[in-house]
Amino acid sequence: MCGIVGIYLKSKKFEKSLGGMLSKMLVSMESRGPDSAGFAIYNRDKNKLFKYSICLNEMNFDRFKKEIKKKIKFSKLEKNSDHVILKSIEKPSKIVPILEDITEISLVGYGKSIEIFKQVGKPSNVVKKFDLNKFSGSHAIGHTRMATESAITTDGSHPYSTGEDECLVHNGSLSNHNNLRRKLKKNGSKFNSDNDTEVAAGYISDSLKDRNLKQTLKKGLSDLDGFYTFIAGTHSGFAVLRDEIACKPAVIAETKDYVAISSEFQAMAHLPNVNSAKIFEPEPGVVYSWGK
């Protein structure tokens, strides 16, 4: 059992409040996932730089800064607890291999919009650690994890990002992730954990080479074996999919200003004007998407 949450803002008037809205949603899902938590915030860099989200793990920030100066031309390093957002004009094709070669750190996401933060611990502590309330943006996705099939580590936490400005959170389990992992590795995909959700994220990234997000998730109904509710994010918005059995809960609240999704309605009870929202459960096997 895990908790998933997401907000897509239709109106810009709530952009500065996005972090605060999401933080309450995450904390309310602590009972569904007390082992770790994480979130992805989409907020395009004003200078159109690429943003690389990095977990330092046990590496000292000063040592990381000293080492990275030798290898990468960057504009800014923004430290937030044990995470760093590296901003650079350099494209991912050049920067990603360099960061992946530094074995002491974990590259958890990259793109011109996305920033990812995740860590082991209770969601309430993770929210405070990264000061989620201060974040602004256009949309955001979050996850609280109760570990089942893989270790309780930062690399085992959601969201997973395996492509530029892409991320995925997942409540459920996949039974064919080992076979799918082997196939994706043959196509060049890389994985940092044994988590089934990372495989699903890799599958989506691989499929997006030839399809849009809605088509990719629809194809996943035949390729991904298991029980799941997905929230998949891109630079322009997000999409939601439940498997065709739909045993994993999800509820959506939509107003003229935002769309919110969570595993339980209680996570959305604090949102503005939620009492007048259109509230519904996503149908099994149907892709719902919102974006610009």
Model regions and ranges:
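Conserved short alpha-helical segments that host acidic/polar catalytic motifs at enzyme active sites
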Residues: M1-K292
